[in-house]
Amino acid sequence: MESQQLSQHSPISHGSACASVTSKEVHTNQDPLDVSASKTEECEKASTKANSQQTTTPASSAVPENPHHASPQPASVPPPQNGPYPQQCMMTQNQANPSGWSFYGHPSMIPYTPYQMSPMYFPPGPQSQFPQYPSSVGTPLSTPSPESGNTFTDSSSADSDMTSTKKYVRPPPMLTSPNDFPNWVKTYIKFLQNSNLGGIIPTVNGKPVRQITDDELTFLYNTFQIFAPSQFLPTWVKDILSVDYTDIMKILSKSIEKMQSDTQEANDIVTLANLQYNGSTPADAFETKVTNIIDRLNNNGIHINNKVACQLIMRGLSGEYKFLRYTRHRHLNMTVAELFLDIHAIYEEQQGSRNSKPNYRRNLSDEKNDSRSYTNTTKPKVIARNPQKTNNSKSKTARAHNVSTSNNSPSTDNDSISKSTTEPIQLNNKHDLHLGQELTESTVNHTNHSDDELPGHLLLDSGASRTLIRSAHHIHSASSNPDINVVDAQKRNIPINAIGDLQFHFQDNTKTSIKVLHTPNIAYDLLSLNELAAVDITACFTKNVLERSDGTVLAPIVQYGDFYWVSKRYLLPSNISVPTINNVHTSESTRKYPYPFIHRMLAHANAQTIRYSLKNNTITYFNESDVDWSSAIDYQCPDCLIGKSTKHRHIKGSRLKYQNSYEPFQYLHTDIFGPVHNLPNSAPSYFISFTDETTKFRWVYPLHDRREDSILDVFTTILAFIKNQFQASVLVIQMDRGSEYTNRTLHKFLEKNGITPCYTTTADSRAHGVAERLNRTLLDDCRTQLQCSGLPNYLWFSAIEFSTIVRNSLASPKSKKSARQHAGLAGLDISTLLPFGQPVIVNDHNPNSKIHPRGIPGYALHPSRNSYGYIIYLPSLKKTVDTTNYVILQGKESRLDQFNYDALTFDEDLNRLTASYHSFIASNEIQESNDLNIESDHDFQSDIELHPEQPRNVLSKAVSPTDSTPPSTHTEDSKRVSKTNIRAPREVDPNISESNILPSKKRSSTPQISNIESTGSGGMHKLNVPLLAPMSQSNTHESSHASKSKDFRHSDSYSENETNHTNVPISSTGGTNNKTVPQISDQETEKRIIHRSPSIDASPPENNSSHNIVPIKTPTTVSEQNTEESIIADLPLPDLPPESPTEFPDPFKELPPINSRQTNSSLGGIGDSNAYTTINSKKRSLEDNETEIKVSRDTWNTKNMRSLEPPRSKKRIHLIAAVKAVKSIKPIRTTLRYDEAITYNKDIKEKEKYIEAYHKEVNQLLKMKTWDTDEYYDRKEIDPKRVINSMFIFNKKRDGTHKARFVARGDIQHPDTYDSGMQSNTVHHYALMTSLSLALDNNYYITQLDISSAYLYADIKEELYIRPPPHLGMNDKLIRLKKSLYGLKQSGANWYETIKSYLIQQCGMEEVRGWSCVFKNSQVTICLFVDDMVLFSKNLNSNKRIIEKLKMQYDTKIINLGESDEEIQYDILGLEIKYQRGKYMKLGMENSLTEKIPKLNVPLNPKGRKLSAPGQPGLYIDQDELEIDEDEYKEKVHEMQKLIGLASYVGYKFRFDLLYYINTLAQHILFPSRQVLDMTYELIQFMWDTRDKQLIWHKNKPTKPDNKLVAISDASYGNQPYYKSQIGNIFLLNGKVIGGKSTKASLTCTSTTEAEIHAVSEAIPLLNNLSHLVQELNKKPIIKGLLTDSRSTISIIKSTNEEKFRNRFFGTKAMRLRDEVSGNNLYVYYIETKKNIADVMTKPLPIKTFKLLTNKWIH
């Protein structure tokens, strides 16, 4: 079937093709910036033309249904009474309707409207009727009378009937929304114009052409009521009607005024972008039009420079003027005036050529006798033209008809005519003939011409592939062809009557013919340029002639209207009439045999065979020409399809579209192989394979059966693996139709995960070739590996897995890469690979006896999937193990075959070979194992020696006691320790590396006790006997040295008949004093759990006075006391009430260590004295700890320890790491896209404000010369990676202003287009707070500035292109960026370098080293945050001088000058600041929180009471596995991100008291359980209840001219998951809190002291940096102090002992602290825990304590 698209005149709608395709309506949601008045006017004209030519029956004239239309009432129903004139408001056909008028074509009365039922409605008087209009022009809403019959008249009498039939006027649509009113008014005005009321419509100046009559006013008023219901009118319309309900004219006038004002600027831009000029109008008029548009745009602030204006003008040039686009496009300095000089020159040359040309012959006979060639006389050219110009055969005709071509012929260069040319013919109307031509037309009757048709001519159509004609007068050799299918541009079929030849006789006496189709159902006679090109005839629209390729002119082309025509006088007429054509197929003499008949006759042979046979006369009686072959190609014989059905051929390369359409790991192939028979039950019988379509990466999984749950487990595993390892989501899985894939369980699983199953079709195994070929390859490899190695067949899957590993690493000959490389993985390290079946010897780490062989033979299979080891088969056990403890046997001829496998016995649980074990043995005492996957079975205590020179069998010499130690005591205690089993933790944090937990060289295996005095003097103590260590925080200090113990493997508990301990003196190696340990009874000992010594000593007793300070420096006592008092004097510490002295508890009656739920995060925390790490033996069962558990539970119950729970087994849940600044939280989107702000915005007022902001942003972009406006680039010519997507974002600021910003999509910017090393710096929050604090203390003026469009001041170095803004209408073009557009990766860094250079070079500032965006000179300090500046100075004039210099270069706005002496309010970077110089400063966010928190959809004040604290002590976050579907999980995670994001923003700004809760909850963003959400809601509720709280600063009144910078540190030991500790620091400048930090320790601490050292080590670097900043900004002397409530930390820092620490990580931290403290003049003092305000950063506190610690600095 031949498909053809042509513009046609539908039998239903007899309008022109142009009208039918250009009539359109502006939709409600259309972008107002893209609507121009000119386009609307054109559309309305076209629509009017189409409507004027339509006729319809009464049944078809109904308006489309509208739910707001009231149904017409029957005439018998009495109308309602309303108003003083009964029944007059209901205008029936006999009363108020004009003749022939009825509502919607029905002869009934008009329905009433809500206006008529309202008290406002007053109907017109009884004499008021609708106007009567002459019948010749039609009446409003008129329909033909029933007597007129069918309105589709014969084409020959259409014109005559047009005057006798009343014109149907389509009513306007019903108004359904106030936002649709502007568009509805356009249709209503059009309705009035069609109703002959155009004269009463107000013009632009608001006055109508003529005065409106009473009848017309009644008609206007009632129709407005009907189609514009009151509930849908805009407010301004209702306001007009409330004053005068009949003033419809005022509404129309104001609407027209609004339309004019809204679209004038957009119209000018659209008109300028769509200029067209071909010389048809005077050049002066064209120049005036263009210059007026440019002047108007310039006056409105849209500056069009010469280069852009010239490009827009040249783009619209055509015809003779087109060559200017090629001669001028590189002229950089061309002006509009120069371009118009060239246009004027060509226009004058054209006019001169036309005046000097001889006229054409008027009739065809004269032309035949004239043999001249119409050569053009040569005239001097003003401008040299390029003779090689490209012809665009798709002229305006194609655009006018909106025809999409189905056959495109190659374009030919026909613009220049060598030696002969014909001037174009321009007709202003059908009666105006240039050059004296006479247009003749045949007298054959056919369809009437359209109004824009040139009679007697053929329309040249470049979009049509076939020629169509309405008259049969010129068709030669006509024949019927019903199988031809032709469609127009609207995809409507055009019936074809006949096909024939169209013969031409051109002016050079040449004849030619083309095929033509006959149909009366078109608006024009169309001549296809494609068919002319097929006979070597082309159309040259530059010279307006038809010519041959050699330049011979055949016929002139006439331009009439927007189209081009060729006269029909060149057609040769035929003698065939219309009836002959319609019946030509009935002639028996010309009838051919149909191909389907011949096909059946000749046994359903194919057409090629039949034609070949007829051509060679193998079949007689008829010839090849006797068969109609037109349908042979497309004919489908149903019987052949059934009888000859075959499988489709596999198309080579058919999967390329999937490779191009999907990203890696989105399209998988899978298949199952098996079963393999005669295997043991432990060996898999099947395997399932997966192959990625893009990377060809392969996976194999073993299966023991093909059950649904087994397959589902594999699918779950691989989907999770791909998601986590490759950050990809599988979209499609292709598989066969086996029951294991088509079952309902798997189908629901795939559907739930959004995966599309792609099944193979029936009997189409080749479509599943990827998976099938992989299985075949793996099985070939498997058989080969088993044959080569000689291993048993039940190891077949190991061979499959080995082959998969290798195949993923081999390069493909086609892609030149391996699957691993495609997947982004490193290549296979062949040094880690062994040949399959390689003989090895595996180390037996746990033999049954010490004399048993330590090696066992085995065979290497493949690298382990779960470790760095190797899977090795052990024949003696018929098992496989995962280990790295093996030795390779180089040849098979070895002792491997001589081993007696039966003589070897091993532990049954060989899975222990895969357990991870970290040795506790020091590197200098036992050689460490290199195998991280095999657990060592050595008792780590058996080989530890404190002094290697002492013999192991002398127990009394295990330690070296002092002389004062009784021998008996030493011996007894040594024996007692020999039976002690020190137990390791049940679980070890998987994140801890081996180096983190390995001991130092002389690590003790027994608890230690240290002396307070000796520790304070730097001494380290050794315990005489291995004694049980007391656990009290206040009375215990553990030592780092201990005695050696004997083998304790065979003793799990203490003996009941052991003697009691006596007081044991302690020998001090660093001090002189000895202390004794109190006695411990057996009963007490039995209740104890041996606690392993921490690597750094625990806290010493804290029973001294709170003023007992330990300064680091050693000045005199008086100076120490003065320094301490000076540092602590102004700090906002709580005032504690006096307390009565209390007795300290017996250290041996303290709480026993309890296995706390270390896998849980606690908002209640774990106290320093009740959290211990219990080291248990891995061999010890749970039943062995009955006493321990019993005591723990009893203690837990009696002490009511809410923050702890008894030990119990619990599955660990890995959470995300704690975030220190919560930078990964997604912010709440407050901006709008272009479509949200303008296109689909139903708020008219807000929409207008956003449009205004849009134009303001565009003007600013043009003003800043953001892009190169001199040249536009084609998208195809630019490297795609240098093209940056752009978009407009809109936002309503807090001050109520609407802002638009044109930004680049930097999130998808290619890495090659920016320098990743450049950084966009902004002022650090600590720097801003420091500057504000110093400003308060020094009475500084604070000035706030803003630089408009700051980024646009920075040039861009890279070559980047963006798409133009949408209002320019150039979607296919690109513009080159010149400035750093917002959103680009490099924009921030470019702006920073630009403003930094200006401030330094022009303003005399210098940047503070180490603090980016902080600039200073001798008088002014500047803090820069992107485009916001905050200036601080003692003298306001200094700030003003900086402002003047900034204004010389940048558009600088003064937000707040800060000159008042009263309280001044600022909004600086989100902080709401109240500042009164010399008195106070208050920092808060009340207004911002009041606006933002309600938008979070959090239930506020559910119980109607305010919270007093953000959390409660003792509450744990339960981390049981969540049972939640995917959608709900994502929704809750998104909610957590919003809540924690806002809380983090507020907390790090000024609410430092909330940082602990924020940090803890941030760790559970990906674990949104109900409990976590409730705690988060509680935190948000507390923020809401305390939103009015402020950080209060008062001016410092120092006794000394010094600046005091203090850091207060604290830590909570082991209260976070995996035994991690929470640390916190608060920083104060001159007694004012300027910052805080709460985070989880990065290392696992084993004691409170280690946690405190970690906290101090985090505080000191920032303290030193702040000290440098303060000294740079203020030249006063500075005193630095560090306060901590850990005396042991202070003791370690001040100690000069150089002995190594047992834990090298914290030892390194401690040594570094010593250096920093001693080298930076830092004072370290003790602060009482009850006064430590940093306690709020590390744990939740009771309400009373929380208020006590915070009420002095935030309230």
Swiss-Prot record:
Family annotation (PROSITE patterns): ASP_PROTEASE (PS00141), INTEGRASE (PS50994)
Domain RNase H Ty1/copia-type: 1610-1752
Entries under Gene3D superfamilies matching the protein: Ribonuclease H-like superfamily/Ribonuclease H (3.30.420.10)
Main location: cytoplasm
Residue numbers carrying Phosphoserine: S416
UniProt keyword terms in alphabetical order: Aspartyl protease, ATP-binding, Cytoplasm, DNA integration, DNA recombination, DNA-binding, DNA-directed DNA polymerase, Endonuclease, Hydrolase, Magnesium, Metal-binding, Multifunctional enzyme, Nuclease, Nucleotide-binding, Nucleotidyltransferase, Nucleus, Phosphoprotein, Protease, RNA-binding, RNA-directed DNA polymerase, Transferase, Transposable element, Transposition, Viral release from host cell, Virion maturation, Zinc, Zinc-finger
Region ranges (Integrase-type zinc finger-like): 583-640
A Pfam entry, by short name: rve
Marked site positions, Cleavage: H401, N402, N582, N583, A1217, A1218
Segments of skewed composition (Basic and acidic residues): 1038-1053
Chain positions covered by the region annotation RNA-binding: 299-401
CDD domains to which the protein is assigned, alphabetical: RNase_HI_RT_Ty1 (cd09272)
Localization terms from the record: Cytoplasm; Nucleus
Catalytic activity: DNA(n) + a 2'-deoxyribonucleoside 5'-triphosphate = DNA(n+1) + diphosphate; Endonucleolytic cleavage to 5'-phosphomonoester
Polar residues bias spans: 1-23, 48-60, 127-152, 1005-1015, 1054-1082, 1101-1111
Domain Integrase catalytic: 660-835
Residue ranges of the region described as Disordered: 1-93, 126-174, 352-421, 956-1087, 1092-1111, 1130-1187
Binding site for Mg(2+) 2: D1346, D1427, D1428
Posttranslational modification: Initially, virus-like particles (VLPs) are composed of the structural unprocessed proteins Gag and Gag-Pol, and also contain the host initiator methionine tRNA (tRNA(i)-Met) which serves as a primer for minus-strand DNA synthesis, and a dimer of genomic Ty RNA. Processing of the polyproteins occurs within the particle and proceeds by an ordered pathway, called maturation. First, the protease (PR) is released by autocatalytic cleavage of the Gag-Pol polyprotein yielding capsid protein p45 and a Pol-p154 precursor protein.
EC numbers: 3.4.23.-, 2.7.7.49, 2.7.7.7, 3.1.26.4
Annotated positions binding Mg(2+) 1: D671, D736
Low complexity: bias regions: 153-165, 402-418, 960-969
Note: Retrotransposons are mobile genetic entities that are able to replicate via an RNA intermediate and a reverse transcription step. In contrast to retroviruses, retrotransposons are non-infectious, lack an envelope and remain intracellular. Ty1 retrotransposons belong to the copia elements (pseudoviridae).
Descriptive protein name: Transposon Ty1-DR6 Gag-Pol polyprotein
Gene label: TY1B-DR6
